[in-house]
A protein has these predicted regions:
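Short low-complexity, flexible loop/linker segments enriched in glycine and/or proline
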Residues: 2-3, 22-26, 114-118, 157-160
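Structural alpha-helical scaffold elements that stabilize or flank donor/cofactor-binding regions
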Residues: 1, 134, 154-155
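Short Asp/Glu-rich motifs
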Residues: 19, 110-112, 154
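FAD-binding core/adjacent interface of flavoenzyme oxidoreductases
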Residues: 36-45, 69, 138-176
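Flavin-dependent oxidoreductase catalytic cores
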Residues: 1-79, 83, 87-99, 107, ...
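Short amphipathic alpha-helical segments and helix-helix/interface helices
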Residues: 21, 132, 150-153
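Beta1-alpha1 glycine-rich phosphate/pyrophosphate-binding loop at the start
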Residues: 78-141, 170
C-alpha cells in the first residue's frame, strides 16, 4: 500500500532466472525459469569456487543475452525432447540455426514429466512447461511421434545431428 517492505528475500530463483523480478513486474510469469530446489547452487558454493545451477546452464557462461550468433546458419536435427534436447534446440535456434526437434513420444518433456507427478515435486512440471514454451516460442520445427532411423535420415538432410535421448533407468533384478 505504501510501497514499503519489511523483508523481501529472493535467493535461488535469481540464480535460475536473473530476470525473475523484471518478469514478474512485466507480467511475464510464464517466462520465468523455475527453480527445482535441487540445491546445486548451495553444494557448488561449498565444494567449488563458483556457483552452478542445475536448471540454468548459462549461469557461469553464456546467457540468453550473450548467445553468439552462428557465422553460417545450418540445418540441425536434435533427437530427443527431454530437458537436454529442449535446451540444445533452444540455444541452436537462438544462434540462428534452422532446428528440427524429433521426439518419439506424443509429447515433449522426457523424464521430467514423470518427475513432476509426486507430491511436492510439481516444480518439475513447471520447469518442463517452461522448456517447452521456449522451444515453441522460437518456432523450432517439432516432430512428435517420430522415430529417427535410416529411412527418416534418407528423406531429410541435416548438417549436424545431436542425440539427446536421455538415460535409461537402472533396474535392479533383486526381486525376481
Amino acid at each position: 500500500e505504501r510501497d514499503l517492505a519489511d523483508v523481501c528475500m529472493v535467493g535461488r530463483s535469481l540464480l535460475c532466472d536473473p530476470d525473475f523480478v523484471n518478469k514478474i513486474k512485466n507480467g511475464q510469469e510464464d517466462d520465468i525459469r523455475p527453480c527445482i530446489g535441487c540445491l546445486g547452487c548451495l553444494s557448488s558454493t561449498m565444494l567449488k569456487d563458483h556457483v552452478e545451477c542445475g536448471i540454468n546452464p548459462s549461469l557461469t557462461s553464456e546467457n540468453e543475452e550473450t548467445v553468439t550468433p552462428a557465422t553460417i546458419s545450418q540445418n540441425i536435427l536434435v533427437i530427443g525432447g527431454g530437458p537436454a534436447g529442449l535446451e540444445a534446440a533452444y540455444i541452436l535456434s537462438k544462434r540462428g540455426h534452422k532446428v528440427t526437434l524429433a521426439e518419439r513420444h506424443h509429447t515433449l518433456g522426457g523424464a521430467m514429466i514423470v518427475a513432476g507427478y509426486p507430491i511436492a515435486k510439481q516444480h518439475f512440471a513447471q520447469t518442463t512447461k517452461y522448456f517447452i514454451k521456449r522451444v515453441i516460442d522460437c518456432n523450432i520445427k517439432i516432430e512428435l511421434n517420430t522415430i529417427v532411423d535410416q529411412a527418416y535420415l534418407s528423406q531429410h538432410h541435416y548438417d549436424h545431428i545431436i542425440v539427446a535421448t536421455g538415460a535409461k533407468p537402472l533396474r535392479l533384478d533383486i526381486f525376481k
